[in-house]
């Protein structure tokens, strides 16, 4: 079911031409900074992959992929990607990327089951990145180091935007706050996971929640994760809590809520994959191409994630609807209401 937040007194700070220029400047500047911070080289990525190889991502495990038959391959089914987490790991192996270096790509996807609204579109564009690591770097401390570098690139980009458009004021705090999903649940035991995100992000401005996908002490998960990319089950000795992954959120004063900008994490090794397949009841995946490659040791240890391009632009340019940043399909009633409210959808 679609939703629409209509911010009181909303007025776009940039017109259409300024917005288009701003989008280009943000994308060029941020990806250059991301590449420099994490030592990533750009690679070309697929829009679709063959079905049944375990390469496409299942996200929360329930979304349907857009698919179509390929005539020249005997009507074999191809799927439009959800994201490229597993494809990137295969590419690290193919390019023989050493620890300390990685890849990034412009990822375009279609998520047909998305609930449409201010922050959610059928069309997804993000920087998908992946970096080879050593076994010693599979820790929460290393995860935090990478998150901090990404956040530094975000703050530099914000400075550039505010210099280009003085009517836009900076909003990101100097530092990002880290908290485990278990600690967050203990802090706000009476709130739902989404309400906890809003509460903690409003307090700190920018937050990274660790351990997305692991079972908390109340028997629930903060959110679901597919079992075969992020490692959400390994216990970190420094915290004695499970999970080497998480979500990066910032506070959006326009929409008066938290916004997830990135989902990322240290990826499963052989032991974590086997454990998470058992926990999720999906041991049959061991027979898929990607999973066989991981289990036979031919894929590198890595860390990676995705960073939403349209959401990042939306926040920097202080827009109220993601449709002010990207071209997509929206319910006619939503288009009408947005026009009445000053949200000019592309």
Region locations from a protein language model:
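Class II aminoacyl-tRNA synthetase-like tRNA-binding/catalytic domains
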Residues: 2-120, 128-132
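Generic recognition of stable, solvent-exposed alpha-helical segments in well-folded globular domains
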Residues: 21-25, 29, 138-145, 149, ...
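Generic structural hydrophobic/aromatic packing signal, biased to beta-strands
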Residues: 23-26, 30, 34, 68, ...
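A generic secondary-structure signal for well-formed alpha-helical elements
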Residues: 34-41, 150-161, 320
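A glycine-rich phosphate-binding loop feature that marks nucleotide/adenosyl-phosphate handling sites
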Residues: 47-51, 166-173, 212, 333-335
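Extended, charged alpha-beta segments that form solvent-exposed binding/catalytic grooves
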Residues: 105-199
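A translation/RNA-centric and nucleic-acid-associated enzymatic feature enriched
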Residues: 110, 181-346
């Amino acid at each position: 079911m679609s939703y629409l937040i209509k911010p009181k007194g909303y007025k776009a700070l940039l017109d259409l031409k300024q917005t288009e220029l701003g989008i280009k400047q943000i994308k060029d500047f941020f990806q250059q900074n991301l590449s420099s911070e994490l030592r990533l080289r750009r690679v070309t990525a697929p829009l679709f992959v063959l079905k049944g190889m375990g390469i496409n991502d299942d996200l929360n495990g329930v979304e349907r992929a857009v698919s179509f038959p390929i005539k020249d391959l005997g009507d074999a089914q191809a799927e439009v990607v959800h994201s490229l987490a597993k494809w990137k790991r295969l590419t690290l192996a193919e390019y023989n990327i050493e620890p300390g270096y990685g890849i990034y790509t412009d990822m375009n996807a279609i998520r047909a089951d998305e609930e449409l609204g201010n922050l959610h579109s059928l069309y997804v564009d993000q920087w998908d990145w992946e970096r080879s690591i050593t076994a010693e770097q599979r820790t929460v401390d290393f995860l935090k180091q990478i998150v901090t570098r990404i956040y530094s690139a975000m703050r530099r980009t914000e400075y550039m935007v505010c210099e280009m458009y003085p009517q836009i004021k900076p909003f990101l705090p100097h530092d990002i706050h880290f908290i485990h999903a278990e600690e967050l649940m203990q802090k706000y035991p009476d709130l739902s996971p989404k309400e906890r995100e809003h509460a903690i992000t409003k307090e700190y401005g920018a937050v990274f929640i660790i351990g997305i996908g692991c079972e908390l002490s109340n028997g629930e998960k903060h959110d679901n994760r597919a079992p075969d990319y992020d490692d959400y089950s390994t216990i970190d000795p420094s915290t004695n809590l499970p999970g080497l992954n998480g979500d990066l959120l910032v506070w959006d004063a326009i929409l008066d809520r938290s916004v997830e900008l990135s989902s990322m994490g240290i990826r499963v090794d052989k032991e974590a994959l086997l454990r998470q397949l058992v926990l999720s009841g999906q041991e049959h995946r061991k027979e898929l191409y990607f999973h066989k490659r991981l289990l036979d040791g031919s894929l590198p240890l890595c860390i990676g994630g995705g960073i939403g391009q349209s959401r990042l632009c939306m926040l920097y340019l202080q827009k109220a609807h993601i449709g002010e940043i990207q071209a997509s399909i929206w319910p006619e009633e939503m288009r009408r209401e947005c026009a009445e409210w000053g949200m000019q959808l592309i």
